[in-house]
């Protein structure tokens, strides 16, 4: 069965265009060219994967110009029988950013029992046409507790974006026109579904772990480290220890930012 975005992508959900901006020629308005991309599709075969996704598929870019990624609609469908256990985390990533917490644009968690799902992310930032041609966006997928034999596809994802292309730096004021944007870092979108699935590792931590390659060097000989002196250098913490501390911090202090989501 083909996976489709529910209805037509509504630009007004992401950009609040005035009547004059809809009617006047582009030279008289700050908004030059609003476009909706073609659908890009990913078939998920592995429990954990980091795949490139073309969020500007079919968008006509301006040479030497810019593109502003305003909004993104992600649709998913489980290719499973009804009432299966488990779930998935889907995280949008800007691969240019080296710090994992800054690379994550938004994440979404849902159970496999919910056969179809759809959510929206509002990245609200611009890049150069040159960078856009390098296909800088990725999707990190983590499927948990779904028991399917290797080689099959438990989940399909599709992506459609709303963007603005322009030749020169866009006029001040457009940011204020983009709706549903909140301060406070990456958005975390969450479904209120109770199943045998629970996301317990922040997606930025999971991305950092996924990006890290095992060291080819052997362990250092630290037998004499700190002996005979009280001011020895402390032993570096393992990833699991840092991850545990991060989880405790999230539970104690962090507050999940809920953005618009739509399921069908």
Swiss-Prot record:
Please indicate if the UniProt record lists RNA-binding as a keyword: yes
Locations listed in the record = Host cytoplasm, Host cytoskeleton; Host cell junction, Host plasmodesma
Q: List the disulfide bonds.
A: none
Q: Which GO terms describe its cellular component?
A: host cell cytoplasm; host cell plasmodesma; host cytoskeleton
What job does the chain carry out?
Transports viral genome to neighboring plant cells directly through plasmosdesmata, without any budding. The movement protein allows efficient cell to cell propagation, by bypassing the host cell wall barrier. Forms a ribonucleoprotein complex with viral RNA. Binds microtubules and modulates microtubule stability. Can bind double-stranded DNA. Triggers host hypersensitive defense reaction in incompatible plants harboring resistance (R) proteins.
| Any GO BP annotation | transport of virus in host, cell to cell
Q: What is this protein called?
A: Movement protein
Stated family: Belongs to the tobamovirus movement protein family.
Is Nucleotide-binding there in the keyword field?
no
Region Disordered: list its residue ranges.
210-264
Q: Name one GO molecular function term.
A: RNA binding
Q: Which UniProt keywords apply?
A: Host cell junction, Host cytoplasm, Host cytoskeleton, RNA-binding, Transport, Viral movement protein
Superkingdom of this protein's organism:
Viruses
